């Protein structure tokens, strides 16, 4: 095994990534999971409210929620996502010595699995996992569009911000894999529009009518009744976000902007370190057989990016948003690879010295963070 590592340094980078992920996990489980724990406590006990689907499912199995369940569910979801992505990469590229650099730049990116480990318990990873499923299942029938709509509804019920976070990427995957690959007719176009309207209506219902209908003191008391250790009241200090109106969220975000904006150069540097991957992605788009496909893919990338710009203006978890934006780019890359191409696009070269240096740096960065870089 050592000889193989020495012959192919990209295998060594994979091993380093695995070790870093273990380290991030060990560090993460020592931190109090404030908001993720509350998400396991909140259910539809008081009626339809936002951010309550996960807690409602948990309530079906247990009346008392232990703290370790945050890490157990988060860890299980992370492992499932890892398995799904490994399967997707195998389907798209295969695992060979030539594809290893591409795999390291995606799976080993601090934007992707390493940051999902750092944000263990948060809801972002559910959008990624469901989008990967849509990249794996057959896409020829309306059942695919219906499945995408169902996934989008589930994501909005988990957290309404998914309408901006992963639903645009899911729409892009549906357009590429179903409408571009199999053609459009009045039936599937009408079905897609109705599905989009239904998901949008659910978002507005969750955002504007999904507020908690009882006083905050009653809500906190209900949360305490579901805690396995009610003495840990410190874990409930963010319960106020279920009462916070959109205007207050935007105000807080802009109030912190002068400080948080300092992280933008770091984000730009992290994005630049993925230049070999972005170059491959651009060449992949340029090699598409259809000009229409090329224009629609570029429009989709702009649309997904604009959704994240809106998120940046509304909520200040900038490190999470930029990381999930990069993950969306990775997933759309896989979708584009499934479209007909006029020519073969060369993979990321393992022989280029600059690429090797960038791959090493990307590997050594353990995460991007939640609000500010690292």
Predicted regions and their residues:
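Membrane-interface transmembrane helices that cradle and orient dolichyl/undecaprenyl
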Residues: 130-145, 179-181
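Perimembrane helix-loop-helix junctions
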Residues: 166-196
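Transmembrane-helix motifs of polytopic, lipid-linked glycan transferases
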Residues: 75-98, 133
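Membrane-lumen/periplasm interface segments of specific transmembrane helices
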Residues: 22-30, 188-280
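Membrane-interface alpha helices of multi-pass inner-membrane proteins
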Residues: 145-171
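Membrane-water interface signatures at transmembrane helix termini and the short loops
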Residues: 112-123, 267-340
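Short hydrophobic/aromatic helix or loop-helix immediately within or flanking a transmembrane segment
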Residues: 45-76
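Membrane-interface micro-motifs in multi-pass membrane enzymes
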Residues: 44-52, 98-137, 158, 314-333, ...
């Amino acid at each position: 095994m050592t000889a193989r590592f020495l012959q192919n340094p990209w295998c060594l980078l994979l091993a380093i990534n695995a070790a870093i992920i273990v380290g991030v996990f060990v560090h993460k489980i020592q931190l109090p999971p404030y908001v993720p724990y509350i998400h396991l406590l909140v259910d539809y006990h008081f009626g339809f409210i936002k951010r309550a689907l996960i807690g409602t499912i948990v309530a079906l199995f247990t009346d008392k929620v232990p703290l370790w369940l945050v890490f157990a569910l988060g860890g299980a979801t992370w492992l499932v996502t890892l398995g799904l992505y490994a399967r997707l990469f195998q389907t798209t590229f295969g695992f060979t010595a030539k594809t290893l650099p591409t795999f390291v730049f995606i799976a080993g990116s601090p934007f992707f699995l390493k940051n999902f480990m750092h944000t263990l318990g948060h809801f972002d990873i559910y959008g990624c996992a469901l989008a990967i499923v849509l990249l794996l299942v057959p896409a020829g029938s309306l059942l695919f569009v219906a499945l995408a709509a169902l996934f989008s509804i589930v994501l909005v019920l988990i957290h309404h911000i998914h309408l901006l976070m992963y639903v645009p990427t899911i729409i892009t995957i549906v357009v590429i894999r179903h409408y571009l690959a199999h053609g459009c007719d009045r039936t599937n176009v009408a079905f897609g529009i109705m599905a989009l309207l239904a998901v949008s209506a659910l978002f507005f219902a969750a955002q504007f009518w999904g507020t908690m209908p009882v006083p905050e003191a009653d809500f906190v008391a209900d949360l305490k009744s579901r805690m396995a250790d009610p003495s840990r009241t410190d874990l409930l200090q963010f319960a106020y976000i279920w009462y916070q109106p959109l205007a207050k969220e935007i105000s807080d975000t802009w109030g912190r902007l002068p400080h948080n904006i300092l992280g933008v150069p770091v984000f730009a540097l992290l994005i630049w370190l993925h230049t070999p991957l972005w170059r491959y992605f651009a060449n992949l788009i340029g090699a598409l057989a259809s000009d229409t496909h090329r224009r629609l893919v570029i429009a989709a990338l702009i649309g997904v990016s604009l959704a994240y710009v809106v998120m940046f203006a509304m909520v200040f978890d900038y490190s999470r948003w930029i990381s999930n934006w990069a993950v969306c780019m990775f997933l759309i890359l896989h979708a584009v690879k499934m479209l007909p191409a006029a020519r073969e696009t060369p993979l990321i070269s393992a022989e280029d010295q600059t690429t090797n240096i960038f791959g090493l740096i990307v590997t050594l960065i353990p995460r991007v963070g939640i609000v500010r870089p690292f």
